Structures are given as C-alpha cells and as structure tokens.
Amino acid sequence: MHFESPIKRRHSRQIMVGNVPVGGGAPISVQSMTNTETCDVDATVAQIRAIADAGADIVRVSIPSMDAAEAFKKIREAVSIPLVADIHFDYKIALKVAEYGVDCLRINPGNIGNKDRIRAVVDCARDKNIPIRIGVNAGSLEKDLQKKYGEPTPDALVESAFRQIQYFDELDFHEYKLSLKASDIFMTVEAYRKIASQIDNPLHLGITEAGGLRSGTVKSSIGLGLLLMDGIGDTLRVSLAADPVHEIKVGWDMLRSLKLRNRGINFIACPSCSRQNFDVIKTMNELEERLDDITIPMDVAVIGCVVNGPGEAKEADIGLAGGSPNNLIYQDGKPDSKTKNETLVDDLERMIRKKALLKEQELANIIVKN
C-alpha cells in the first residue's frame, strides 16, 4: 500500500545532540536508556552497543554519583553513538561529565536545585557547546507546584517547564529541548499539546514508567501515537520495564506505522484461521528472528490463504499467499515462484535477502549520483 502520511509536523528550532539533529524538520530520532550499573563499564558499554545495533540514534546513561561520572569517561571513549547524561539532585555531576565529552545533559527542574546551580550547568554547557534537556516529570515536580495544584496536572507540568524556559532565556541559552512526562496518558498528551502551541523548542516525547513490555508498549503507542499524529515530537523514548533493545524496536515500529521514518522490514501478516494453508504464526516468528538484521526498508506480506493473500502480496516487495497444493510467492507485485510448506521459510528468507541487497545497491547508486 502506498498511501502517504497526512501528518504535518510542528515547526521547531534545531539543536544537535552529537551528530544527530533534533528538531527543525530532522527525522524523529529514537533513543533509549541503559539499565545497567553505570559503574560497571563493560556491561554498560555492551548494552549501549546492543541498543545502537537495534537502531538507536541516541542513548541516555544515568549518572547517579561521581563514581558513575568517572565511569562515564571510559564509556564515552568506548562508543561513538551520541550519549545523554541523566542528572538528578547533584549539579556538580553535570559539570564533571561535561568534561568527558557528553553530547547532552538531562536535568530535572524538580530536584536539580536553585537558580545558581542551574546557572552553573548552563554556563558549563554553553562553554562546551552541549545542549540540555529540561526533563519535567510528574513524579518529581517542585514542592511549591505540588502544593499549588494538589496533584500532578498538565498545567503543573507546563508551569514547571516554563520556569526553566524563562530562566534559560534570561541566561540567553537556547540550545535545549523539553520533555513533560507522566505515567498517565491523558496528562502527558495534554501537557505536550499545551506547551507545543506556545514554544518552538524541540520536544522529547515519552510516557514515563509506562509498564512492562506488553502494557508499556500499548500505553506508549497510544500516548506517543496521538502526539505524533498531531505532528508533535522531535525525538522519542519508549519507556519499558524490559530490555532497552525492545524500546528501540517499538519506537521504530511506531514511526514506521505512521510513515514518519522507515527502517527494516514492515511485515504484513494475517492472524490466521482455519483457511490457512501453512502455519502463519510459526512462519512469522521464524522470519522475524532470521531477518532482524535487515535495515533496508521493505514490505513483506505473509498471508495464509487465497482470500486476501494475492491482493496483499501484490502490494508488497515480497509476498507469500497460501495455496494448495503449493503456496505462491510474489515479487514486486507479480507471481514469482511456488513453494511448499516444508521449504517456504528458507525460500522466503533467500528472496528477501536478495531483494534487500538489490535495494541497498540501488540506494548506494543514488547517493553516488547525487
């Protein structure tokens, strides 16, 4: 299917997180956060590399102590992907990691301290050309805002953000992005919508503490999907109580589904029924596992019978339609070959990899010509 996305993205200014542009019409970047002990350098580096291999543009690392800041120095030297240092409570930690090549500083206005401390972080960031993320969170609002509103609300999140915006403007510092996160979908969406209409700074999207792999994926897909459909968002993190690699995969699935970015295989598969001529679920599981390394955008249809099989298969780069006695493989909308149930996964994998290689070569030729 070739229906174009109707989404018109919100205009925002652009900042650079390392070599990744955020805002200003740049592709929506996908990021995650390590959940290792930062002082365990080997484990943290290994996880960052796994996250990067999954397709991350940016990785955030928690820096809860000066020891972690010293570990960050070694981590920074070991990986090339842009790194964000997540700082809470102690502003001096931000000053320390700034010396070690961090690409962005995340500070929480609810716990970073008074204006003098914020000024120190801003002055350091300006000197070293490091952007800042103002990360407002419903679970850690300033005490006076908690008292004023009684509980976290969209307006409380927005007011917290504007306090920092005003002070950053007073300091003539504009290299920053914002996030206004809550675990409640409605609160988060309303807060982002309110602030998006009033400022042009890039926005980092997320539903904080969304839950485990299944529930967190659902919550994040609804909340972030609503905002992305509105054209709001310049970078995103799907927060899951799961392996961070899953956060990257879900984030890419969201962007692919909304036709905002494309990476890897877009599988179209039927849920299967008694009409299926092969085991659709088993086939899909095997294909997803085998083809996880492919990054070139492709559409692959796996349909178990002739009801919708030929129609869906014709719209895909590679399509499989169940049939008897043999199943039919389509390529670029045309019947290509027949395959038996016993060999269909191997046959599909071979054709998909060949097609992916051709697409990569075509893309390389286009780049060379330009």
UniProtKB/Swiss-Prot annotation:
The keyword Iron-sulfur applies. GO terms for molecular function: 4 iron, 4 sulfur cluster binding; 4-hydroxy-3-methylbut-2-en-1-yl diphosphate synthase activity (ferredoxin); 4-hydroxy-3-methylbut-2-enyl-diphosphate synthase activity (flavodoxin); iron ion binding. InterPro entries: Dihydropteroate_synth-like_sf, IspG_bac, IspG_bac-typ, NO2/SO3_Rdtase_4Fe4S_sf. It catalyses: (2E)-4-hydroxy-3-methylbut-2-enyl diphosphate + oxidized [flavodoxin] + H2O + 2 H(+) = 2-C-methyl-D-erythritol 2,4-cyclic diphosphate + reduced [flavodoxin]. The keyword Iron-sulfur applies. [4Fe-4S] cluster binds at residues 270, 273, 305, 312. Converts 2C-methyl-D-erythritol 2,4-cyclodiphosphate (ME-2,4cPP) into 1-hydroxy-2-methyl-2-(E)-butenyl 4-diphosphate. NCBIfam families: ispG_gcpE, PRK00366.1. This is 4-hydroxy-3-methylbut-2-en-1-yl diphosphate synthase (flavodoxin). It comes from Marinomonas sp. (strain MWYL1).
